[in-house]
Amino acid sequence: MAKLTILIALVAALVLVVHTSAFRSSEQSCKRQLQQVNLRHCENHIDQRIQQQQEEEEDRARKLRGIKHVILRHKSSQESEELDQCCEQLNELNSQRCQCRALQQIYESQSEQCEGRQQEQQLEGELEKLPRICGFGPLRRCNINPDEE
């Protein structure tokens, strides 16, 4: 019985070591991937979306004031290309955890340019939508804004 207990303890310790090693390896792999992938297209896409939202809000405000001149904006081919390339970049990352880290990295770099909490919320919202738009569904347990954890 004592030998069985020792054997079980050794197996449990071995499983823990292997799991910890795999996790550490996964973290290092993600860091390498994030250094290699260029997230510029994602940043450009998010910038365009936030700018578009602001223009739409300004247009609504003009309408409410009775100004009839409203700019209709259609999605340009450049915007579509930025989104496509962004999705390709995110898809290159091999795990949801790594994709989440990429979105957090974009948030950290882009939030510095935000003028107020409303723009930060728009940024967060656009980043949360991105995985669904790219076709790999919502990221589970991914807090885009690491300051809110």
From Swiss-Prot:
Disulfide bonds join 30-98, 42-86, 87-134, 87-134, 100-142. InterPro entries: Bifun_inhib/LTP/seed_sf, Bifunc_inhib/LTP/seed_store, Napin/2SS/CON. It is found in: Endoplasmic reticulum. GO terms for cellular component: endoplasmic reticulum. It comes from the Eukaryota. Gene3D superfamilies: Plant lipid-transfer and hydrophobic proteins. Belongs to the 2S seed storage albumins family. This is Conglutin delta 3. It comes from Lupinus angustifolius (Narrow-leaved blue lupine).
